[in-house]
């Protein structure tokens, strides 16, 4: 495993938890608008007819030839804030994504996340 430096290269790959349990498929990368660095990924989870995209922080993520490993358990990701597969993250929902993972959102009025 090595650090996940360019997550865009891993779109469509399997995402696993620290124990190696498959969570889903890497769908998109969201960057912090102040640094343009990856901040969250979305992972396609759920049943075939009811897929959704769950947000997961990239801090501590690593990659191997077959998967991206995140630092959160499968159950935590399954319960995380999510959007429809064709949806967009509303600006009003951003603070909730950060709060779910106990991350500081700050008090800035502009958006913190942008899909790349």
Which residues does each predicted region cover?
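Peripheral interaction segments used for macromolecular assembly
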Residues: 1-116
């Amino acid at each position: 495993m090595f650090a996940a430096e360019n997550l865009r290269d891993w779109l469509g790959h399997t995402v696993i938890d620290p124990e190696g349990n498959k969570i889903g498929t890497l769908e998109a990368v969201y960057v912090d608008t102040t640094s343009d660095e990856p901040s969250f990924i979305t992972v396609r989870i759920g049943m075939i007819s009811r897929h959704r995209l769950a947000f997961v922080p990239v801090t501590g993520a690593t990659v191997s030839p077959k998967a991206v490993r995140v630092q959160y358990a499968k159950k935590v990701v399954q319960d995380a804030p999510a959007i429809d597969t064709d949806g967009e993250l509303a600006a009003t929902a951003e603070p909730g994504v950060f709060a779910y993972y106990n991350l500081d959102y700050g008090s800035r009025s502009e958006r913190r996340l942008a899909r790349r």
